[in-house]
């Protein structure tokens, strides 16, 4: 079964990647790299780290057209900062992967459907 693991961070808790020192980036990057290497057989798409939510643009479809605004689609402190796609036997295995991720305060797990 394929699952998307979305890595979420609390924007008010600690520095963002861009705010970290090069040394802190290297340390955390190494931990994340090891996590990817240890789980390479189960991760089928390494995904990407996403830019800060302050760089987001949102299109809201309304009657009569779309409204485009700067910023994320929800107001809140916790935002998606990256993702991977895992191919694992079941949700329990996806949870085991999520529990070992070395960064981010929350990992949201969603199954992928066969529908586009």
Question: Which stretches of residues belong to each language-model region?
Answer:
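Conserved, structured core segments of small domains
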Residues: 1-116
